[in-house]
Amino acid sequence: MAVFEDVRDVVVEQLSVDPQAVKLESKIIEDLGADSLDVVELVMALEEKFEVEIPDSEAEKLVSIQDVVNYIEKLGK
């Protein structure tokens, strides 16, 4: 759950959303109101937080918070 909490913190900071609104099933664009620029900035913030590089081809697949958590866990962070 630690990865989720860290992801949630980044999402809350980047998108200025209520922490209660960020759930594993939340979709970044549809549910949390992000636009394409928000998504780019979110990916950059996640890369910095977790010290990883997320290629554009992978970033496009990160639709929900669960997708983000799974991806970061897969990288072993």
UniProtKB/Swiss-Prot annotation:
Q: Name one GO molecular function term.
A: acyl carrier activity
Q: Which residues form the Carrier domain?
A: 1-76
The entry's family comment says:
Belongs to the acyl carrier protein (ACP) family.
Q: Which domain of life is it from?
A: Bacteria
Q: Which residues does this entry mark as bearing O-(pantetheine 4'-phosphoryl)serine?
A: S36
What is the name listed in the Swiss-Prot or TrEMBL entry for this protein?
Acyl carrier protein
As for what it does, the entry says: Carrier of the growing fatty acid chain in fatty acid biosynthesis.
* Pathway assigned to this chain's UniProt record: Lipid metabolism; fatty acid biosynthesis
Chief subcellular location: cytoplasm
For biological process, the GO terms are:
lipid A biosynthetic process
The protein's PTM annotation reads: 4'-phosphopantetheine is transferred from CoA to a specific serine of apo-ACP by AcpS. This modification is essential for activity because fatty acids are bound in thioester linkage to the sulfhydryl of the prosthetic group.
Q: Which InterPro entries match?
A: ACP, ACP-like_sf, PP-bd_ACP, Ppantetheine_attach_site
Cellular component, GO annotation: cytosol; membrane
As given in the record, the signal peptide range reads: none
Keywords, ordered alphabetically = Cytoplasm, Fatty acid biosynthesis, Fatty acid metabolism, Lipid biosynthesis, Lipid metabolism, Phosphopantetheine, Phosphoprotein
Q: Where in the cell is it found?
A: Cytoplasm
